[in-house]
């Protein structure tokens, strides 16, 4: 009988979500899904107030103007740079002046790499200066540079097939762009795979959906036991040109010179501000973006926009005189571009309280006009998030997609905390990503207003609901 009872409970649990009779537990309380739907529906007026203030009202364009002031003043914010630390101190002051609570800096250790002077020139079959951007963490060349013949390949499979041709050469990858997740492996692993077959350097076709002769930088990693070789990204145009030349049987020779250096790790800070919860202050909805960037462009899109709509979300809640039941916590991460370095240390520092995190949110895919929210969590939590997103019907942004994305929140998501990220126009995003084109010109104030409204509504409602989002 005991077994049959538990079997009955399991069956009811499995089928009840669609019927509106799912049981959620918070302490000793039991609530049906219908009751939760009704609770969320009661936030309609609050959601409209947030939308009106952000998109049509007094504070429209505020996140855009705040962002422009920072990036025009400071510029790009590479991990380990003085620019990044200047930006952190400015944001620390800004958040205090904005009237947010518990504003503080949490110290972390981060990498310090500088690209130095760099150049690449094709000297055979003709003289042609290549636009390049060294990849983060790359070693430099000898002072005199490297002059070597080129081997062009379209994939790692082709590289292995032609391994006997690679020794002493510069491997040029002309991999096709499918999507970022699949194509970025060439940037991440290109140098290692080339070094394994004896190459002296690697040049990788930029991981981008479109190019107007623009190289795109990014993170790459070396592997223990494999020689380190210099590595950089080149433009799509030059990669395709060299592929055509090679297919005709032309010999290609490049002179590569890179002054990149890695210095000892240095101190930096994650920047934190809150609106303290009124009823469950120890419980948290985390809203975030990263403050660091690469050393090209202004870091406006990646990830100034995400950081500033996250700040704007708390500002909007504060400006409306709202105080959610649980704490809204803003975190502006440092050293995300080096693999979530600041976020990993935040996780280690705070994971003892993991049961108190209802939702972790990160905006790091641009702040163009969002089409919805990407979400990772239990089926119960997803059903709740669909109801929350229905409050954004006035903006026609109500969809909930699978798989929240965010280097900085993945630590929490993998540990079972529900996670959310903006669903954005990634095709357009990769026009500018990690390039000199990542400037305020890529930003649209009206689209930032909408993104901030979506972010604020979701964060506030989840933070103010009577119960935390249920986990698996």
Swiss-Prot record:
Q: Does the keyword Cell inner membrane apply?
A: no
What post-translational changes are documented for it? N-glycosylated. The secreted form is modified by hybrid or complex type oligosaccharide chains.
Molecular function as annotated in GO: carboxypeptidase activity; metal ion binding; metallodipeptidase activity; protein homodimerization activity
Chief location? endoplasmic reticulum
Output the Gene3D superfamilies linked to this UniProt entry.
Answer: 3.50.30.30, Zn peptidases (3.40.630.10)
Instruction: Give TM segment ranges.
Output: none
Positions annotated as propeptide: 21-44
Task: Give Gene Ontology CC terms.
Answer: cytoplasm; endoplasmic reticulum; extracellular space; Golgi apparatus; lysosome
Task: Report the enzyme's class at the first EC level.
Answer: hydrolase
Residues bound to Zn(2+) 2 are: 302, 337, 434
Is DNA-binding one of the keywords?
A: no
Per its UniProt record, what Pfam families does this chain match? Peptidase_M28 (PF04389)
Q: Where does Zn(2+) 1 bind?
A: 290, 302, 364
Subcellular location field: Endoplasmic reticulum; Golgi apparatus; Lysosome; Secreted
Give a GO biological-process term.
tissue regeneration
Which keywords does this chain's UniProt record carry? Carboxypeptidase, Endoplasmic reticulum, Glycoprotein, Golgi apparatus, Hydrolase, Lysosome, Metal-binding, Metalloprotease, Protease, Secreted, Signal, Zinc, Zymogen
- From the Swiss-Prot or TrEMBL record, give the protein name: Carboxypeptidase Q
Q: Which organism is it from?
A: Rattus norvegicus
Q: Species lineage, top-down?
A: Eukaryota, Metazoa, Chordata, Craniata, Vertebrata
């Amino acid at each position: 009988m005991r077994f049959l009872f538990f079997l009955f409970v399991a069956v009811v649990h499995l089928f009840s979500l669609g019927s509106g009779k799912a049981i959620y537990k918070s302490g000793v309380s039991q609530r049906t899904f219908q009751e939760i739907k009704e609770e969320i529906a009661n936030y309609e007026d609050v959601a409209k107030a947030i939308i009106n203030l952000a998109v049509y009202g007094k504070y429209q364009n505020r996140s855009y103007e705040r962002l422009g002031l920072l990036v025009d003043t400071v510029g790009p914010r590479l991990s380990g740079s003085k620019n990044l630390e200047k930006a952190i101190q400015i944001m620390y002051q800004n958040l205090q002046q904005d009237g947010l609570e518990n504003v503080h800096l949490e110290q972390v250790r981060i990498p310090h790499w500088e690209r130095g002077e760099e150049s690449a020139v094709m000297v055979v079959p003709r003289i042609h200066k290549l636009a390049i951007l060294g990849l983060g963490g790359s070693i430099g060349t000898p002072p005199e540079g490297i002059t070597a013949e080129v081997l062009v390949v379209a994939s790692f499979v082709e590289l292995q097939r032609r391994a006997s041709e690679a020794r002493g050469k510069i491997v040029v990858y002309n991999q096709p762009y499918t999507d970022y997740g699949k194509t970025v492996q060439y940037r991440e692993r290109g140098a290692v795979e080339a070094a394994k077959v004896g190459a002296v350097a690697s040049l990788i076709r930029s991981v981008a959906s479109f190019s107007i002769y623009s190289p795109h930088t990014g993170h790459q990693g070396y592997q223990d036991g494999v020689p380190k070789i210099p590595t950089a990204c080149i433009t799509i145009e030059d990669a395709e040109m060299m592929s055509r030349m090679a297919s005709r049987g032309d010999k290609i020779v490049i002179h590569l010179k890179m002054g990149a250096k890695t210095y000892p790790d240095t101190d930096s800070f994650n920047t934190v501000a809150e609106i303290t919860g009124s009823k469950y202050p120890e419980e948290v909805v985390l809203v975030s973006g990263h403050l660091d960037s690469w050393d090209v462009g202004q870091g406006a899109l990646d990830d100034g926009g995400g950081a500033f709509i996250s700040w704007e979300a708390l500002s909007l809640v504060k400006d409306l005189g709202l105080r959610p039941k649980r704490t809204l916590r803003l975190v502006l991460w440092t050293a995300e571009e080096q693999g979530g370095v600041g976020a990993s240390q935040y996780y280690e520092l705070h994971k003892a309280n993991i049961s108190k995190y209802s939702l972790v949110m990160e905006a790091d895919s641009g702040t163009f006009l969002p089409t919805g929210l990407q979400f990772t969590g239990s089926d119960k939590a997803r059903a709740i998030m669909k109801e929350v997103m229905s409050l954004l019907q006035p903006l026609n942004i109500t969809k909930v997609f699978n798989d929240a994305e965010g280097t900085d929140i993945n630590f929490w998501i993998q540990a079972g905390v529900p996670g959310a990220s903006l669903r954005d126009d990634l095709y357009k995003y990769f026009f500018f990503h990690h390039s000199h084109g990542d400037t305020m010109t890529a930003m649209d104030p009206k689209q930032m207003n909408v993104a901030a409204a979506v972010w604020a509504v979701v964060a506030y409602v989840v933070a103010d609901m009577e119960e935390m989002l249920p986990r698996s």
